[in-house]
């Protein structure tokens, strides 16, 4: 058994040993000795393949020579054309100055100014239903800054009474100016009133207020407590 293993090991060692390379040969085409061994063609020791460094061509020893031009085995170098990459094309197409934000500082100021003017005109139109805005804290409503926010239920005195105005998020895209005078106006976009109806409503309201004021003043003058007592 031991002898069998020794024989097997010797056979494996013999099989693992690679055959020595063949001796250098002269090029079969140009007769140059500047050659090198490459490999065995089809794993056969009888077909060693060589490469000639002089004419840059391969040949197999003992095989037929093909009609290969000088340097035909090497690939010709292709000239590269410097083409811009996709990233460069995108960067050139999109310049830093061409991209503008939706609102820059100047446009934002212009927008706020125009929006403030529209909101002020709307508040002035609502205020005209009751009286001139000069009686309402010296025109405070007309000078509303578009980005200023008031607390809800901000009371403004009006003659002998008062009315409430609620401002929510003045200066945002959705202006909510709620007027609590017998009802709420949720949005100035929903406030539509004919000029003729508004004028008639103002006249009737002013007449009613004047009548109430005259009656109150007349009854106060005619009250017995206001009569001066005469006599000795």
From Swiss-Prot:
The entry marks the following residues as binding Zn(2+), namely 27, 30, 52, 55
Q: Which GO terms describe its biological process?
A: regulation of DNA-templated transcription
Q: Where are the transmembrane segments?
A: none
Q: Which InterPro entries match?
A: Dof, Znf_Dof
Cellular component aspect of the GO annotation? nucleus
Gene Ontology MF annotations: DNA-binding transcription factor activity; sequence-specific DNA binding; zinc ion binding
Q: Does the keyword Transcription apply?
A: yes
Q: Where are the zinc fingers (Dof-type)?
A: 25-79
Give compartment(s): Nucleus
Query: What are the protein's UniProt keywords?
Result: DNA-binding, Metal-binding, Nucleus, Transcription, Transcription regulation, Zinc, Zinc-finger
Its job: Transcription factor that binds specifically to a 5'-AA[AG]G-3' consensus core sequence.
Output this protein's name: Dof zinc finger protein DOF4.3
Biological source species: Arabidopsis thaliana
Upper lineage: Eukaryota, Viridiplantae, Streptophyta, Embryophyta, Tracheophyta
Q: Report which gene this protein is encoded by.
A: DOF4.3
